[in-house]
């Protein structure tokens, strides 16, 4: 039993895994993580609509053939099929088939505003894990959220370019360099997805590192960001598999059912993101507590 309560892992700063899990369970039981996840998912859900409008209104200005089909194909790989067919594609078709003057600038402003609001909501959730409330004033919070939003947008566009243009580049490289080996092409594709995974990891690490208004920061490369990266991918795969089996649910509720499923998918990812942050917060909390107890023991000894 003693070994169980003292066992630790790399990246835990010698904090026992038992103490970390105990802290996480207590936070979930208090309903703090689920409540914050609902708030974050709702904020980003509102930002999704103008984001889609902005992205697909921008497509005609990009001189690449088959760009729309490639983008829909990528969305289809990430999100459950039922959501894509009844919800995403419906929105995309409406944007492309009914062009509206001035929509690009309006959609970009709305996307920026609501995305920034989502980051504000996320930072607020992070601060509650530290028991820190509103240490930054309104303008400081907005400015930080805007900077993080713009950085995340650049990382997102980079990932999107790698996904969409990657196949085209690989095809041309294969022709120019006379690459015929399927293993070589597979390795190049694997490298491309590893870079995208790295960009996703960096995005989460940026939020964990710069988001909380704490004097002492987490490590940029942390256990929590690793858990959130792989956890969200695994959760999305499980959720996609589960939703794909609910054909009756989709046929009954149709478009509104797709909205509910999309919100649920965003909630699951927000929940995993907060669990990753709570893991870092638990290590931080228990490490400080351990140091305090050691200091008190040394004072008593003296």
Label the predicted regions.
Residues 2-302:
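Membrane-embedded alpha-helices and immediately adjacent juxtamembrane helical segments
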